[in-house]
Amino acid sequence: MRHREQLMAGAKQCLEERGYARTTSRDIAAAANAPLGTINYHYASKEALLNAALLEMLQEWGDKVRAQSAAGRRVESMWERVVESEATDRPLLVASAEALAQAERFPEIRQQIAEAFERSRTEMAADLHGIDATDSAEDKKLARAVGSVHMALVAGLTQQWLIDPEHAPSAREVAVGLRRIAEDLDPSGA
């Protein structure tokens, strides 16, 4: 494995073990068994490397929780996988929350996260609802709206699970709540 790949693997390990905020360049170099200077050579900065590693990990996480389910159960199945992952992938979700806090002060982090959010919106709309954002301008707007709602729910659910897992909602509670909200939003009252 070359230094670039070693650094990526080391950064992922550090994100899991130490989190985003507590990981130093020395931690990454030690985990990667690579010279300290190779971080700046290959990634320009520790933050750029951590961002790349975190975004890659989050993409893998998103792919896992959005895995296809039987028609009619896609959304509820995804929420079941999200809730399950809140416990099994806690270190990744903590690192993600730490990175979001850093975005306020580092424009490059903000830009990378914003681009990942935009991709996630359309992926969620396509995977869960069959909305193809490339079909028309109307579908692009719909995909953005539907994906944004799912992302808001994932973020809120993650915060609840990180702070108070004992009282955080189950997948079933999320589904029940969404159904009720949908009923209340139905203008026909049906």
Question: Each predicted region: which residue ranges?
Answer:
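Amphipathic alpha-helical segments used for helix-helix packing
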Residues: 87-114
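Hydrophobic alpha-helical connector segments
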Residues: 48, 52, 63-93, 139-150, ...
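Short, Lys/Arg-enriched anionic-surface-contact patches
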Residues: 2-3
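Helix-turn-helix
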Residues: 6, 10-48, 52
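Short, basic, alpha-helical segments at the C-terminal edge of helix-turn-helix-like DNA-binding modules
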Residues: 55-60
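Hydrophobic/aromatic-rich alpha-helical bundle segments in the mid-to-C-terminal region
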Residues: 109-114, 131-190
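Short, solvent-exposed amphipathic helices
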Residues: 112-123
